[in-house]
Amino acid sequence: MKKIIFMGTPSYATCILKALVENENFKLVALFTQPDKAVGRKQILTPSDTKAFLSQNYPSIPIFTPSSLKDENIIREIKDLNPDFIVVAAYGKILPKAILDLVPCVNLHASLLPKYRGASPIQSAILNKDEKSGVCTMLMEEGLDTGAILESLECDIKDKNSSEVFELLANLAAKLILTTLLNFDKITPKKQEESLATLCRKIKKEDGLINLQNARELYQKYLAFTPWPGVFLENGLKFLELELVDELKQNARMGEILELEKESFLLACKQGVLRIKKLQESGKKALDGRTYLNGKRLKSEDSLC
């Protein structure tokens, strides 16, 4: 039975953690995750998704929430746990060389490396209209997602939003980590092709700001930034649910309401048409498209804003 230290934080990581802790071939000896964070208007101290899962279901397994992994006491603690592997998935902290050198550190990255190294591989794949994505297991080194690839699995992501792709890739990663660790001694690590490498940065709230220039580009942003940060106009109006109707139509005014439907409406972009199904003004409740227009006394051929 191989001893595992798992390092991960969000729900994506929880899916992988669950697969490991439930598998009889592995023994989870510790979880490392981000410290509890103050959440919401009341700033309630809230544990990470992985910590909440493990403490509720496996309370005897130790959980560590260090502010830094460079602390000598933390490194000593990891040595004392004597793991066979350290598995990392969306942890949110960089592992120092002192830890990387202890045992094989296997990272699960949500892209087909070397494409989309960095913090937002799923959103970047959607923004770039990729129809395929996947997940890789890789041997960690000091560079950002530059380690040798062990195994990978591919899937279709066309017309899926980030939330859906996260769930899809989390399930793939949960399967992949088991095969990678069980077959570790038989796998020949493959160096990444540096000439094909691309980087992606962390998503910020302001990335959700949209205009009505291009319906296809707006739709891709909507898919990429659902559920966070969402997409919103400069006046704060959020589009919560929408569909791409036409990519090419250009014979209407940008922002013109083209047609009212039972619970939605068609909206003209400079290029293309969208169906707006649900939207929300800042500080107000979400409404279906038709109800919103009725409340604003807007009709066909009027401008949305």
Curated annotation (Swiss-Prot):
Keywords: Protein biosynthesis, Transferase
EC main group: transferase
EC number(s) on file: 2.1.2.9
Catalytic activity of the protein: L-methionyl-tRNA(fMet) + (6R)-10-formyltetrahydrofolate = N-formyl-L-methionyl-tRNA(fMet) + (6S)-5,6,7,8-tetrahydrofolate + H(+)
Residues involved in (6S)-5,6,7,8-tetrahydrofolate binding: S111, L112, L113, P114
NCBIfam families recorded: fmt
Xref: HAMAP family: Formyl_trans (MF_00182)
Name used for this protein in its record: Methionyl-tRNA formyltransferase
Organism the protein comes from: Campylobacter jejuni subsp. jejuni serotype O:23/36 (strain 81-176)
Lineage, opening ranks: Bacteria, Pseudomonadati, Campylobacterota, Epsilonproteobacteria, Campylobacterales
Gene assigned in the entry: fmt
